[in-house]
Amino acid sequence: ALLAIADANKKAQTFKSVVNNVNFALESMARNLRTGSNYSSEAFLQTSSCSTGYKVGISFTSQEDESVSYFLFGTQIMRQVNGGTAVGITAPEVKITRLCLEILGTESGDNIQPNVLMIVGGLMEGKTKLQSRFDIQTLITQRIIDN
């Protein structure tokens, strides 16, 4: 019984670490999009894992005036700054199976604040073969007032 409790505790700690990684990666992405501007997804493919109009990546201008892109590569969300080397922002234990991004409100005079609908789905796998599926949807609105 003691070994079962220890094993359950180990699984819970591993799972918590993976969940924290997903939370950190997606919150960082959302924060950067919220404080950025000039959203575009023209350079990215349309994804078949979501409805029409969604893309697998997004580019924008950060508050530091850098060109930033987030996109799905294999099973990892990548971040690229100013055309440099793309870096994964999700841990290897997190397998992203879909990243769907839809940009709304970027047309001039549409009276809609630019925003991005983001849907992320995947699997979290711990070292103990504990696996859990997740789907997250969030709407990110640009802070800079649209003209």
What are these regions (language model features)?
Residues 1-30:
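Aliphatic-rich helix starts adjacent to a transmembrane/signal segment
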Residues 18, 22, 111, 129:
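Aromatic-acidic/polar surface patches that form glycan- and anion
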Residues 21, 53-55, 113:
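Short connector loops at helix/strand junctions that flank enzyme active sites
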Residues 23, 34, 78-79, 143:
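Short, cationic motifs built from Arg/Lys/His that form the positively charged side of catalytic pockets
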Residues 41-109, 133:
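Type IV pilin-like appendage domain
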Residues 85-92, 96-102, 113-147:
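Low-complexity, S/T/G/P-rich flexible repeat/linker segments used as non-globular hinges
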